């Protein structure tokens, strides 16, 4: 039973808590997000207590009906919070007692807020996994659909932000889609470690009253139970993994956003964002700003900060539960909200993006085929290092003459290497260039189509 002060732990205290400390200690402002899973866990625990002979069937039914009523009030937005409701567990138990009386005091038998809160968090994150996994799949599907539809479009590939080699536009899209498939796989792995039940661990030593944890595991549809009660209440590996997953996913999304921001400038003019994902300037009427992409790029650092912050919290804690762990939930809630918004906006950007095919084609230049010139000599039997040097010399000759590489005459090329012959003209065909990269993973059409099929298969797993 709660003490006169209304605190679940107040029986040991004679004095009241300083109001500033009371506010400082409270987590109800954010852990109220857990109201539904907190009630879900309590329902399962009440059934576990009845199975262990700690509740009569009538008491269990009374508690379950009361918890249903509490859930209705939350769902209808009429649940009232009071100053003494320091967290979601206190609030729900207080309201349950108001509804059903003293029987509510039996619900917490053998249970600590230590195992209760981490159970709640795992339940909540399990739901979040399903949502984020769906949004991530939708984004990848949008990217693959676009890659398939625009497979014939060629444009410059860049290294060091310098034009490097001709590639398919689809190849660029898929480079980011493939990175996101790894994020999807990682999220599935994190889910496995989220889906482990700590309930029944008590505060530290376990449960002494015969509560069947395997029964609770089945009731809440967890995949396994935790192995050690001390570890169960204090470990937040699953939170750290989730935050790291989000950090890595945001890294990939930020890099894609950076590319698109550059490609959308007048200097590149390869793509144009839809009005739906752009904003303007309050001073300069001509501006169309890629705020959607800039915010994706910026929000990555917020996620990184939450991940680093949690690790800093965890690394200095002594064994078992410490109040520092209260900070984990704000990180999880914020990052979940951020990822939900970012994935949806990124999907909208990709789905509505307009590409300027002519500008992409015009940006291709013969100097980007210098590697192809080296490959030409390799096919004639020259070792690659010699071929690389010969191609480099041809580039120098063209620069000295002030002409494009493809404007060198056959005679001029033959001064570099006698292996050049009239068929060298095939080298200057951009379509021919991309089609030579037929090895799996390359930018030839057959390889790009193979990549598309592989990504689609991954999405079905």
Swiss-Prot record:
GO terms for cellular component: cell body fiber; cytosol; mitochondrial outer membrane; neuronal cell body; perikaryon; perinuclear region of cytoplasm. Its EC number is 4.3.2.1. It catalyses: 2-(N(omega)-L-arginino)succinate = fumarate + L-arginine. Pathway: Amino-acid biosynthesis; L-arginine biosynthesis; L-arginine from L-ornithine and carbamoyl phosphate: step 3/3; Nitrogen metabolism; urea cycle; L-arginine and fumarate from (N(omega)-L-arginino)succinate: step 1/1. GO terms for molecular function: argininosuccinate lyase activity; identical protein binding. InterPro entries: Arg_succ_lyase_C (IPR029419), Argininosuccinate_lyase (IPR009049), Fumarase/histidase_N (IPR024083), Fumarate_lyase_CS (IPR020557), Fumarate_lyase_fam (IPR000362), Fumarate_lyase_N (IPR022761), L-Aspartase-like (IPR008948). SUPFAM superfamilies: L-aspartase-like. The record marks 294 as: Increases basicity of active site His. One of its GO terms (biological process) is response to lipopolysaccharide. Gene3D superfamilies: Fumarase/aspartase (C-terminal domain) (1.10.40.30), Fumarase/aspartase (Central domain) (1.20.200.10), Fumarase/aspartase (N-terminal domain) (1.10.275.10). The active site is at residues 160, 281. Acetylation modifies enzyme activity in response to alterations of extracellular nutrient availability. Acetylation increased with trichostin A (TSA) or with nicotinamide (NAM). Glucose increases acetylation by about a factor of 3 with decreasing enzyme activity. Acetylation on Lys-288 is decreased on the addition of extra amino acids resulting in activation of enzyme activity. The modification N-acetylalanine is found at residue 2. The modification N6-acetyllysine is found at residues 7, 69, 288. It comes from the Eukaryota. Keywords: Acetylation, Amino-acid biosynthesis, Arginine biosynthesis, Lyase, Urea cycle. 2-(N(omega)-L-arginino)succinate binds at residues 27, 114, 159, 289, 321, 326, 329. Enzyme activity is regulated by acetylation. Homotetramer. Forms tissue-specific complexes with ASS1, SLC7A1, HSP90AA1 and nitric oxide synthase NOS1, NOS2 or NOS3; the complex maintenance is independent of ASL catalytic function. Catalyzes the reversible cleavage of L-argininosuccinate to fumarate and L-arginine, an intermediate step reaction in the urea cycle mostly providing for hepatic nitrogen detoxification into excretable urea as well as de novo L-arginine synthesis in nonhepatic tissues. Essential regulator of intracellular and extracellular L-arginine pools. Belongs to the lyase 1 family. Argininosuccinate lyase subfamily. This is Argininosuccinate lyase. The gene is Asl.
């Amino acid at each position: 039973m709660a003490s006169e002060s209304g605190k679940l732990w107040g029986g040991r205290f004679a004095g009241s808590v300083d109001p500033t400390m009371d506010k400082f200690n409270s987590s109800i402002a954010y852990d109220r997000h857990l109201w539904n899973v907190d009630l879900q866990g309590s329902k399962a625990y009440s059934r576990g207590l009845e199975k262990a002979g700690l509740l009569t069937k009538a008491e269990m039914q009374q508690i379950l009906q009361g918890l249903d009523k509490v859930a209705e009030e939350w769902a209808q937005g009429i649940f009232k919070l009071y100053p003494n409701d320091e967290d979601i567990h206190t609030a729900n138990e207080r309201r349950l007692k108001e509804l059903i009386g003293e029987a509510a005091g039996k619900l917490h038998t053998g249970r600590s807020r230590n195992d209760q809160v981490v159970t709640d968090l795992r339940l909540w994150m399990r739901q979040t996994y399903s949502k984020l996994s769906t949004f991530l799949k939708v984004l990848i599907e949008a990217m693959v659909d676009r890659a398939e539809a625009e497979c014939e479009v060629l444009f410059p590939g860049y290294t060091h932000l310098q034009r490097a080699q001709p590639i398919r536009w689809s190849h660029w899209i898929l480079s980011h889609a493939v990175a996101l498939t790894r994020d999807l796989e990682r999220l599935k792995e994190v889910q496995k470690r989220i889906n482990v039940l700590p309930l029944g661990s008590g505060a530290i030593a376990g449960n002494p009253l015969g509560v069947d944890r395997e029964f609770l595991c089945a009731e809440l549809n967890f995949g396994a139970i935790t192995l050690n009660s001390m570890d169960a209440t204090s470990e937040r590996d699953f939170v750290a993994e989730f935050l790291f997953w989000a950090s890595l996913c945001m890294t990939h999304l930020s890099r894609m956003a950076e590319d698109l921001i550059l490609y959308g400038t007048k200097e590149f003019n390869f793509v144009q964002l839809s009005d739906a994902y752009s904003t303007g300037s309050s001073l300069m009427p001509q501006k169309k700003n890629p705020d959607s992409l800039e915010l994706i790029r910026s929000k990555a650092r917020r996620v990184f900060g939450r991940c680093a912050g949690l690790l800093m919290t965890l690394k200095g804690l002594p064994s078992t539960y410490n109040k520092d762990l209260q900070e984990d939930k704000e990180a999880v809630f914020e990052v979940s909200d951020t990822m939900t918004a970012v994935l949806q906006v990124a999907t909208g950007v990709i789905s509505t993006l307009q590409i300027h095919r002519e500008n992409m084609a015009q940006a291709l230049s013969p100097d980007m085929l210098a590697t192809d010139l080296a490959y030409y000599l390799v096919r004639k039997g020259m070792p690659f290092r010699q071929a690389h040097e010969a191609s480099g010399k041809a580039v120098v000759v063209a620069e000295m003459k002030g002409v494009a590489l493809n404007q060198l005459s056959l005679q001029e090329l033959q001064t570099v290497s006698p292996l050049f012959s009239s068929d060298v003209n095939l080298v200057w065909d951009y379509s021919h260039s991309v089609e030579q990269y037929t090895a799996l993973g390359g930018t030839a059409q057959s390889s790009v189509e193979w990549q598309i099929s592989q990504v689609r298969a991954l999405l079905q797993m």
